[in-house]
């Protein structure tokens, strides 16, 4: 499950599964032998047990019976044991007061710089002593190198999979109790010491006796359920006090409940096994993604057996390609299926030795409802296109703003806050910076943080943090937006189609610049996960990809828009051609309306778009620059003059045979479709001229 550290020797279990297996088990079973051999690393009592072991008195009965988070029940349990609650409050208070006191003393004595590393290490140790709830919070923070100093980052990163393990004797006894068989009947080999330890449990490497498969055996840490139950109770009390004081707009109690619900699900290893099975089914087929197999027949609520994966932690290798794979997989999780990994810290990813991205630990998962997924994509779309009025409505849809919020004031505030952030283009937008900018307006307009939102945002923020550790200039939104653009252009959701229609037709005017941007971004998905460059010129590759996309079933909605606008433009082109002969010697008169001129400019942009996007961008500026000073007929002549010549259109013709058969068949239907639309427009124009 986790990388086997080189410093951790495997005595009874060879790391290489091709090596010969020792037929005699090298561990004692308490059922067959009263002697117990404990590894040197496990002889020391871990600090969580040492400092917070008094919580175990509850773990033996009430806490272990909590199969899921239930605040009223937890509240009732601890009301019967007020001394434990008071002792925990005193422990938390004195622990943090002690550490902050040392920091203040360092500042007073002007030795902060010298003691910085020492205090970082002390903080890590104190968090471990307090238990898994605080470790989980620190793990999230440790994945953001842009938010905390490097020394603290290094220390807190150790919490991801290098926490002091608990006794192997206790772990082996738990395995036997949970699975109902002696260890030597379950495994032919098992490591005498854990190969990794985390906040909720620790992992052993083993080989199944029946099948000989190499597996990871995760065993739950004693007392975690009691500690998390009590700590979430305390956090909820604090959230309630803040709410009563009116110091926060969000329902903090609901946020704590959402987080606690996820933690309790994470402590149920049977639930984790089912999550892993579902995750493997949905995302295991993605290129270069590996999801280990779960062995549910060997798993219980406290013991989980899964396929062993060898590799290195993602933040230990400089592999930006795998980050892109992770971004694509996260896009699928959040916006395609809505079932997402809500705890993506570096310890839960591996780079396998054959270059795949392995996902580990499926305890904390989230569900993103379809209407929220669509709302999130719409918000990204409107943000990138600076449509802040629509963005304010999106925030209502997402539950961030109450429906009664003053939309015009919110729109102005969002414009002030985000205009600067997106001025450098979508590929340079920092997700972390956006969150920081958004925070400036949250209190003023009574923004709320829905319970689901905190997990989604944390997932994206942590993913960007991992990427920044590999590439400091990496922007997760810039890498995700091409997939969002493609999804918006191809999705059958009525909500997204309506949003796209409104974006492209602003007050009835077709915004081809926005379509160009969406198409350009969506085509980046074709090469995002390609390690070897595609052979061919950049313009030819772009044209081929654009045509292939437009003439597929998925591109039907965009194709309809393009055909509609192309027919308008072709109609305007015909009128302009007729005018050039009719009025060539009779002055500046023209039958072209302003709508015809707009359609003609759009026609030029469409032709240029499919014959070379760089040309479109450079030449339209010339039309715009001189258009206002020219008569309609002169401008029409200039546009017609700048249209690509037949020779310049030859690259498109050479690409057509390379398109998929499906696209070629739809292309053959194009002339008939266009003729029908042109006849309809000509008939409608004739009727208007007769009766109007």
Swiss-Prot record:
| Matching InterPro entries | ABC1_dom (IPR004147), Kinase-like_dom_sf (IPR011009), Prot_kinase_dom (IPR000719), UbiB_kinase (IPR050154)
GO terms for molecular function, please? ATP binding; protein kinase activity
Q: Which residues form the signal peptide?
A: none
Binding residues for ATP: 195-203, 218
Q: Where is the transit peptide?
A: 1-39
Q: What is its EC number?
A: 2.7.-.-
Which UniProt keywords are present, listed alphabetically? Answer: ATP-binding, Chloroplast, Kinase, Nucleotide-binding, Plastid, Transferase, Transit peptide
Q: Indicate yes or no for the key word Transit peptide.
A: yes
Sequence ranges assigned to domain Protein kinase in this UniProt record: 189-523
Q: Does the keyword RNA-binding apply?
A: no
Taken from the UniProt entry, a GO cellular component term is: chloroplast
The listed locations are:
Plastid, Chloroplast, Plastoglobule
Q: Where are the catalytic residues?
A: 343
Q: Which family does it belong to?
A: Belongs to the protein kinase superfamily. ADCK protein kinase family.
Know the name of this protein? Answer: Uncharacterized aarF domain-containing protein kinase At1g71810, chloroplastic
Instruction: Tell me which species this is from.
Output: Arabidopsis thaliana (Mouse-ear cress)
Q: What is the lineage of its organism?
A: Eukaryota, Viridiplantae, Streptophyta, Embryophyta, Tracheophyta
